[in-house]
């Protein structure tokens, strides 16, 4: 199954490059349909959290509208622990359960929302949508989103709202971010970005902030105890957990290498043009790499980094568009695609991303 997922966009990429922009849009749409099919038709065992969402969904037919936003929800049949869901996601579950009570439908609906938002985002923002799809697969974003559906919907709602910043429309931007927060509260960090992303950021800012974050992250365990004494218990527990996973640190390091490689292939003039034309990409890169740097000593920083990390699938194609020499650009794309593919194979040998392997269709479970 995974070989099909990887080979299919690669074939469509060749088609799109030969036939032009319109064919690339068709190729993107076809790829998204295939991605939706495998995401929607997976069994409850594909993705660690999938079974939890299915279990919760089955409780909504018994929940009244009056209790919709206050009812306790249990992600396991034994009801040994409780999961507090945001109001927007509760409303989605309730409306869907009225007409489609079968358990698989929540997976289908989550997948449809994720892929529809992905399609809208890539069509609007990516100059090379098929390369973005390749990175979406090989950087593990696709499989991660199978595991954390609420987060994925919230993040993509945030990304698709960024065009309001370019148009300087505060009200629709805030409304869309509040919609994202109604699916996952972590999306609240997108609210202040309206005033941050369009400042005149330079690549030296990215470098300095990432280096400073790495130093702070490495030193953080030394002062974690003092931080705990200054914060309430709930916050102290969140900000003092220091057993960072090596996987997230390695992912951050690989992201930094990809960005550095593309910058290395660009001339100084091309880099300056990128700085002046795409401050949004620079800021989001700085945010992601800095949070991965903090993750050296602060495990909770990885969750925040996950909000900005997926932006790389659009950032890299946009960076490549500033390379003026067609041969140099094509060679950089090829090296980038090969590096991402090799990284994916090695990562799958070491770690099962989001508990999504082995894959199984729901009707075969």
Mark where each language-model region is.
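Membrane-interface alpha helices of multi-pass inner-membrane proteins
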Residues: 138-141, 172-196, 289-293
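Transmembrane-helix signature of polytopic, membrane-embedded enzymes
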Residues: 22, 119-139
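Membrane-embedded helix bundles of polyisoprenyl
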Residues: 130-148, 152-159, 186
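Transmembrane alpha-helices of multi-pass, membrane-embedded glycan-processing enzymes
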Residues: 93-96, 106-117, 151, 157, ...
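Short hydrophobic/aromatic helix or loop-helix immediately within or flanking a transmembrane segment
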Residues: 51, 55-59, 69-101
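Membrane-interface transmembrane helices that cradle and orient dolichyl/undecaprenyl
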Residues: 158-171
């Amino acid at each position: 199954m995974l070989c099909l997922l990887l080979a299919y966009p690669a074939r469509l990429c060749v088609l799109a490059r030969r036939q032009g922009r319109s064919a690339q849009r068709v190729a993107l749409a076809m790829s998204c349909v295939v991605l939706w099919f495998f995401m929607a038709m997976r069994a409850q065992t594909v993705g660690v959290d999938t079974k939890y969402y299915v279990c919760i969904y089955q409780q909504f037919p018994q929940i009244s509208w009056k209790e919709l936003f206050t009812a306790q929800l249990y992600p396991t049949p034994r009801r040994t622990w409780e999961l507090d869901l945001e109001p927007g996601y509760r409303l989605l579950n309730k409306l869907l359960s009225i007409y489609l009570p079968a358990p698989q439908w929540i997976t289908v609906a989550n997948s449809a929302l994720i892929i529809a938002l992905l399609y809208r985002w890539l069509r609007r923002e990516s100059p090379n949508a098929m390369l973005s799809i390749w990175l979406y697969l090989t950087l593990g974003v696709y499989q991660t989103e199978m595991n954390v559906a609420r987060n994925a919907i919230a993040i993509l709602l945030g990304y698709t709202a960024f065009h309001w910043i370019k148009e300087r429309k505060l009200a629709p931007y805030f409304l869309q971010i509040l919609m994202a927060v109604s699916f996952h509260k972590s999306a609240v960090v997108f609210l202040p970005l309206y005033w941050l992303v369009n400042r005149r950021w330079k690549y030296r800012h990215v470098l300095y902030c990432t280096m400073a974050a790495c130093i702070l992250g490495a030193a953080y365990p030394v002062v974690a105890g003092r931080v705990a004494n200054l914060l309430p218990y709930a916050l102290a527990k969140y900000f003092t957990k220091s057993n960072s996973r090596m996987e997230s640190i390695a992912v951050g390091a690989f992201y930094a290498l990809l960005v550095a490689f593309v910058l290395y292939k660009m001339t100084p003039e091309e880099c300056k043009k990128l700085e002046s034309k795409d401050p949004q990409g620079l800021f989001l890169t700085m945010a992601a790499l800095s949070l991965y740097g903090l993750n050296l000593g602060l495990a909770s920083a990885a969750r925040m980094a996950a909000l900005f990390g997926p932006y790389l699938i659009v950032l890299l194609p946009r960076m490549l568009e500033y390379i003026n020499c067609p041969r140099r650009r094509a060679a950089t794309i090829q090296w980038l695609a090969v590096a991402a593919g090799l990284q994916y194979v090695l990562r799958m040998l070491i770690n099962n991303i989001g508990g999504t392997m082995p894959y199984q269709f729901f009707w075969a479970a």
